[in-house]
């Protein structure tokens, strides 16, 4: 189990990042950049409310909290849609910051009092929750118009030439899908339980699809020919007027990114495409999207040892030697930038850079047991969602694993999502 010292470090790192993302004036925090997203001040107070609920009140909403019930209810994500939150009588930014600080002080006291053999999972869950909201706030900030508020604080390594369009073989046979709490104590409920599945051999892209490759799709009329699209995808394309990835400007040579207008790097993984677009691109390219089971095998399975790797590259914790994570770069890295991060089959950039769409709907693994936060996964099973894998440049390294499962509606584009192709053999 993760030590109290490590948990305290991860809590501090997440909070420092959160506060950087709300280090703006009140008007900025209280406005809504897009109906798809909450005002930043809602996310800030929601982070504190969930931390208080799980770490100070044992997950019992009936137990008195620091906020009046009517105020606390404003931060129930199931009761209030993102579009409606700007109209709610939310805490002011100053009160939200003060509330979060008060909760954090008490949470650290609770962590210090945790017995040596105590169950620290709920702390890991709260750390994951805050970091996931930090990525959500980055999505909101990317939708903002006007002069830039954010600037990258980390440089990216150079890519390698002739990586786009290449693929690697993933051998057929059984592998262990998912994880158990004993091996990954911080894993969330939908990642469990570990179980053996058989996967036929296939090929998978060595790297994600690039902007340059996507431009070829556009130039070849990919957005104007229904033959590449599913029936539902084509209907959505027509209704939404899609002609290029979100944030690409007319003409396809420049884009907006966090308020900056810039040239589109040809060797960077494409992002801000929906599942429908990813599906159409794959058909045009003579390929398909991987299932999430295929994706996890390509990422984590080592046929030489007949066992899972904790990370694609092995057991070492994620660093900028292996992957582009942590949100400091504000963009994906060029393909081929992380050869040391390759998986056993040779696939690169499986973690970080862009979330990767799979064909899989969100379903529980056999033996699924909901965690203490029962509404994390269960309400979304069987819904209109597609699973995304691998994380993005905006994900905190401490919460990401090959088994981590994200999901969203197939029409979503504001997320930092891209594409990796697969082929039958």
UniProtKB/Swiss-Prot annotation:
UniProt xrefs under InterPro entries: CTDL_fold, DinB-like, DinB/YfiT-like, EgtB, EgtB_Actinobacteria, Sulfatase_Mod_Factor_Kinase, SUMF_dom, SUMF_sf
GO molecular function, one term: gamma-glutamyl hercynylcysteine sulfoxide synthase activity
Protein source organism: Mycobacterium tuberculosis (strain CDC 1551 / Oshkosh)
Binding-site residues for gamma-L-glutamyl-L-cysteine, renumbered to this chain: 82-85, 408, 412
HAMAP family cross-referenced by the UniProt entry: EgtB
Organism ancestry: Bacteria, Bacillati, Actinomycetota, Actinomycetes, Mycobacteriales
NCBIfam families reported in the protein's UniProt record: egtB_TIGR03440
Pathway linked to the protein: Amino-acid biosynthesis; ergothioneine biosynthesis
EC identifiers of the protein: 1.14.99.50
Family from the record: Belongs to the EgtB family.
Catalytic reaction annotation: gamma-L-glutamyl-L-cysteine + hercynine + O2 = gamma-L-glutamyl-hercynylcysteine S-oxide + H2O
Gene name linked to the record: egtB
Name assigned to this protein: Hercynine oxygenase
Keywords, sorted A to Z: Iron, Metal-binding, Monooxygenase, Oxidoreductase
Function of the molecule: Catalyzes the oxidative sulfurization of hercynine (N-alpha,N-alpha,N-alpha-trimethyl-L-histidine) into hercynyl-gamma-L-glutamyl-L-cysteine sulfoxide, a step in the biosynthesis pathway of ergothioneine (ERG). ERG is one of the major redox buffers which protects bacteria against redox stressors and antibiotics; loss of ERG or mycothiol (MSH, the other major redox buffer in this bacteria) leads to respiratory alterations and bioenergetic deficiencies that negatively impact virulence.
Description of what induces expression: Expressed in log phase, part of the egtA-egtB-egtC-egtD operon, which does not include egtE.
